[in-house]
Amino acid sequence: MQRRQFLNTLATVSVVSPLLLSSRLTQAATPPATPSALDPARWSPLNQKRLQAVINEHGVKSASYRPEQRPYAVFDWDNTCIMNDCEEALLVYQINHLQYKLTPDEFAAVVRQDVPNGAFMKDYTTVDGKPVKMEDIASDVEADYRWLHANYKGLAGDKSLEEIQASEQYKDFLAKLYFMYDAICDSYPVEIGYKWILYFYKNMTTAELQAMAEASNNYAIGDALRKVKYESSRTLPGKAGVVADTHFHGIRIHEEIRGLMHTLRANGIDVYVSTASIDDVVRVFAGNPHYGYGVPPENVIGLRMAMEDGKYTTRYQPDWHFNYGPGKTVGIKNVLVKQKGYGPMLVAGDSDGDAWMLRDFNDTAVGVIVNRMKKGEIGADSQQAAAQLGKPDARFVLQGRDEHTGLMIPDEKSLKYGKDELKLLA
């Protein structure tokens, strides 16, 4: 998955009853019938051949298949099963609709929770190059929220959402709150930022969060893929000053991944998702039949927040691992290997958050890397995939996509947004 996504959503939130959402997620556990062969679709021909060989070797057609020990596959979600990040889309959908259940004092505590004071890393400055301190920008965002809370009719005021969105306070709030998210994720250990985004769900029920997530998904799927720069208010510079950030809008379903999931199940291979987003948000996208992936809610492993009286708190669930990087391997071991006695047959991912689970299990026949030409830990896995290109027993494969369309392409190389040349590696 990729952090640092920013979705400017202005659609009206749809209301989904808990009963209806539960019904939809239950239906998702039974996918439609699919052929046992993997549709070539837009897969790289080499990848389709390798995946089909792995399915044949481990699925129901194999002489060694044992139904009491069903093989399984594990997929990262954001930027693997879809293009872009559904939880980050939700962050801005929540901002745009001011869908908070926080008093101003609660918001003031949440926006500062677990984040050190002091200047962010040098990449995060004001538009005129001055350092931005956490305590200053938090103060500005708190002041914005207090005004928004007092004035928006969906909270404690009487102004419409359209009136609110035309205000300087809203403009400042949107740009600065997302700038904070980016800056926190890049300036401090990633665990701080990944959990911080979840604290804004405080006082929501699971049904309320999932209804908001579905509305956000639907808007993002219909939104254009485009990069837009957002700047905070120049008339309300506050303590931090004027900041700006750029976001890549839109989400797209990766039809080849969705098809692979159905083909795996048709061949007696179970499908799981491991995500560094909160599990309840990804369960909507992975399980709602409107999106077609067919992953039941219990098969999603992600971040978890402690609940109190049926509502989210700002406490991470005690004794639950942080499901990112090495933590994804921990989650697979604690949840799946502990139950089954063996590791995943196939793992798919796109970033450093997935690099360890892609390579940590001896039982894994193939690791599918959605190629984003990244360095770091996933870059090391990608280098191995490039070295094994075309080998019939390749342990890693690179799958290309075009970021202008959000579609996979029949190549190992990818096309970055704004570029016109396919590339294999960073």
Predicted regions and their residues:
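Active-site neighborhood of HAD-like aspartate-dependent phosphohydrolases
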Residues: 66-68, 81-114, 126
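N-terminal export signals
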Residues: 5-26
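C-terminal segment of N-terminal export signals and the immediately downstream linker at the start
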Residues: 1, 21-49
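C-terminal cap/substrate-recognition subdomain and adjoining C-terminal extension
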Residues: 10, 35-40, 46, 65, ...
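N-terminal regions that are enriched for targeting/export leaders
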Residues: 54-55
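Asp-based phosphoryl-transfer active-site loop
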Residues: 71-84, 358
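Non-catalytic, alpha-helical, charged scaffold/linker segments
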Residues: 101-202
